[in-house]
Amino acid sequence: SITKDIIKKYGPVVRSGSEVFEERSSFQVIPVSPALDIALGGGLVEGTWATFMGDPKSGKTTTALQFAATCQSEEHGSRPVIYMDVEGRLKSMNLSGVHGLKIEEIKVVGANDEPMSAEQYLNIAETYIKQTPNCVMIVDSISALIPEKELIDDVNAQFRPSLPKLLKNWCKKLGGIVPRQRAIVLMIV
């Protein structure tokens, strides 16, 4: 049969619809906040991506960290949390209002002396997502990511913005991996 030939050539890439739906129906819905949960149908589902957008100081980081605290609870699987501190602005103020956050268990990725490129941040995030099932990946913020070319070129150099293309390719590359890993990716703008 065609299916057997495809499986022989590509591996177990064909499954029945009932298998897929059964697997997906077991995905947990994790609450974010009462107001957002109403709009989201109860919260964020494992294996999804979400973008938090809003004005500066509107609570995007705090909301993401509160969601991380919920994910760390036993009720929601004691999920590992990785926080990409792209802006380098994670402060105790962000953490103080977050009930139940286990800060000692969060892995914070951020530049030290030298700035890190968008490619470095995205590669690190990809590695964590691929190797850490059920993780929560917070990228704060995607608008602060700087492609390597822009980091090394002169400020006056003429070039086309490459961040949208980088993000598009990164999302495409991880599109099937995030659901398989039951990861949740939160990107703050």
Where are these regions (language model features)?
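The Walker A/P-loop phosphate-binding site
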Residues: 1-108, 117-118, 122-130
